[in-house]
Amino acid sequence: MEAIKTARLPGRCRSCRTHRVYPIDVRKYPGIADTKTGKAFLAIAPNKSEENMQKIYDILNYAAFDQPNEANLTAKDLVNDFGGAKVKEAWSRNVETAEKYNDPGTFTTLIGWEWSSNNRGANLHRVVFMPQGGDVANQFIPYSALDSDDLEDLWAWLDSTSEKTGADFVAIPHNPNISLGLMFAETRLNGEPVDAAYARERMKWERNIEITQIKGDSEAHPALSPNDEFADYEVYDFALTPDGARPAPTKADYVRSGLKTGLELEKKVGMNPFKVGFVGSTDSHTGMSSAEETNFGGKGSTTQCQKNEHIQPVSVPLKVGIWEQQDGLAYGQKVILSQSLFDAFQRKEVSCHYRSAYNSASIWRL
């Protein structure tokens, strides 16, 4: 949440051992400090030492999975203590900020959020955005994984909210590579097989997919494409579980094999649920663009560069060892407006912007 300050001293993610994390300083926010979660945090971590921040991060990680933790918190506690009015307040601030800085044709903002489903450690996150402004966005509270971690429930909510408010939505799945075999699965989360109705709903909302970002590349894996010498490009296989497990890759985790599965399903059910365009992203959650070498925002607060630090090609010490190269996005449209951006995504006239020695992008239409 934008207005909640982060602690100055970070902990480290147990999954990768290097990713720095920044739990909130609950003492500054009575609405959180007075909750069961807030009181537990204050008792366990009375100061903002790195050791204490690590404790808080570990508690959040284990509580989210309803696993034993030092504070005896559950996932339900987190929902009760961080949901409700706090979500509405944060959403209103985000909408207000987007409206404030929107300058159509010069700097176009889009209102959206991340539906962060983490089904048993499987990354099923969807980034959702809309072309409409605050007058529409303030008519609803974003649907989150706290409401449901089943993507079909998200689609149903998008359907009903679109009908009620007139909002149009685009949902983009990201990080298939750590989806634990669920992103391109032939079986739905409810155990039923993928059918034509499922395929229609998925293609209605999810016409593109993220193929590469800082948490690795999702196009291919050397174990699945042994004859492709480039399939080992930026492999990242840490699951989003507290123990940082590294499960074996499956064909349902990677775009190349997922496209093939889609063609097979089209023969079976009459429609392809995985006929998607490709985008590349940062997943930095900073809001800073990194499209210019002379104005590089970094992959996060630990890798931000000072002014002019990267004007010349130099060797920069690695500050965060787990992240891969972040990527960019291009789209096929002459005018940078929120509606034209939305339309380009609907047409799948978007691109994966692989980063290398030079900035380059291609537009794909599938």
PLM-predicted stretches and their roles:
Residues 1-366:
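Extended, charged catalytic domains and RNA/DNA-binding interfaces, predominantly
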